[in-house]
Amino acid sequence: MFTRVVELTSKPRKSRELSSLINDKIVPILKKQAGFVDEIVLVSDADSDRVLALSFWKTREDAERYQRGQYNSVRETLQPVLETEPVVRTFEVHTSTGHKIASGKAA
């Protein structure tokens, strides 16, 4: 399993609107992508304008296909409420209590 962690900084006091946009506009797009597993959105309790969006994918290839195909459109949808450009980092999932993982890969 593979994860994309997207670090977002909303305009001041826009994190709730950003979270709503992700839930209402972006999650439906993600659900249509091959290999998409889950999306988790975290809002910092120390800095409410900082948001992490974690998307989980069956394989690195699935995540990369999304990056090449849909991500620019998604970023444009979020742009009006963002203070800075999103920062994307990727990780291989090795342990999860919520998803089946076998030898560092989705079961």
Go through the PLM ranges and name each one:
Residues 4-7, 56-57:
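A short alpha-helix capping/helix-coil boundary motif
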Residues 9-22:
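Short, surface-exposed ligand-recognition loops at beta-strand->loop->(often short) alpha-helix junctions
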Residues 2, 9, 40-49, 76-107:
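Glycine-rich beta-strand-turn "strand-cap" elements at beta-sheet edges
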Residues 24-25, 29-37, 56-90:
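An amphipathic, aromatic/His-enriched active-site/gating alpha helix that lines ligand/cofactor pockets
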